[in-house]
């Protein structure tokens, strides 16, 4: 039987010979596996474990037709999981927000923020398209937008335009709230709950230009949406 190295995600033969599920560390070393897997000694569970939740192991076994030794390196699996988390965070940053509503709403970097539909209301030909009554935006009527989740990190005009009810007097109310709440302390970082048309403004952390963490979340209590306010303000729909 041909033994293949499954510890580093490579599909390459290691050594031909009989495979023993109860192999010791020395036998693994002879097979060329030791040194690439953080086994820490004999561990039969690493050979026999077949977890239904471990996608990397199932993919590895499926690629090899189920003939590979059932060895899953914990270190390699942890590295793969960490890489997946890093890629997911980067993807969320490119989309302008974080998955965790308690995480920082502002992402470092000079990347220009754009709306959910990929347009920017701040410059270029899309600006005219995004204009609505009273200087707000009726871009929602064009069918481009779906409401963002709380903590999406959208700022200023983008937060207004993706509101699920951003037309008519609703736009006026949102703009009024921004004037009253934002200009008072110079913070322009806002997040908006499209379902309730609530504007959340982050408080300052004591230094000009620096923003606090998003400490407001929309939660379902008694079957209704309740808004938790801690040092912030909100507008009713």
Swiss-Prot record:
Residues 96-105, 120-148 have a biased composition (Basic and acidic residues). It comes from the Viruses. Residues 1-23, 82-167 are annotated as: Disordered. This is Uncharacterized protein 058R. It comes from Frog virus 3 (isolate Goorha). The lineage of its organism: Viruses, Varidnaviria, Bamfordvirae, Nucleocytoviricota, Megaviricetes.
């Amino acid at each position: 039987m041909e033994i293949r190295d499954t510890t580093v995600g490579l599909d390459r033969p290691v050594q031909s010979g009989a495979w023993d599920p109860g192999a010791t560390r020395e036998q693994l070393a002879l097979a060329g596996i030791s040194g690439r897997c953080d086994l820490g000694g004999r561990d039969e569970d690493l050979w026999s474990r077949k977890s239904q939740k471990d996608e990397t192991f199932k993919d590895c076994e499926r690629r090899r037709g189920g003939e590979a030794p059932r060895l899953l390196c914990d270190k390699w699996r942890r590295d793969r999981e960490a890489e997946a988390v890093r890629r997911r965070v980067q993807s969320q940053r490119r989309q302008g927000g974080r998955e965790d509503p308690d995480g920082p709403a502002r992402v470092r970097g000079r990347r220009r923020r754009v709306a959910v539909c990929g347009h920017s209301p701040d410059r270029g030909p899309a600006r005219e398209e995004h204009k609505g009554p009273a200087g707000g935006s009726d871009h929602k009527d064009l069918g481009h937008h779906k409401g963002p989740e709380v903590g999406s990190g959208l700022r200023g005009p983008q937060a207004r335009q993706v509101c699920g009810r951003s037309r008519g007097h609703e736009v006026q109310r949102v703009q009024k709230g921004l004037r009253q709440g934002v200009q008072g302390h110079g913070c322009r970082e806002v997040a908006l709950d499209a379902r309730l048309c609530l504007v959340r403004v982050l408080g300052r952390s004591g230094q000009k230009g620096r923003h606090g963490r998003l400490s407001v979340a929309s939660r379902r209590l008694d079957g209704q949406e309740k808004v938790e306010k801690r040092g912030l303000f909100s507008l009713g729909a």
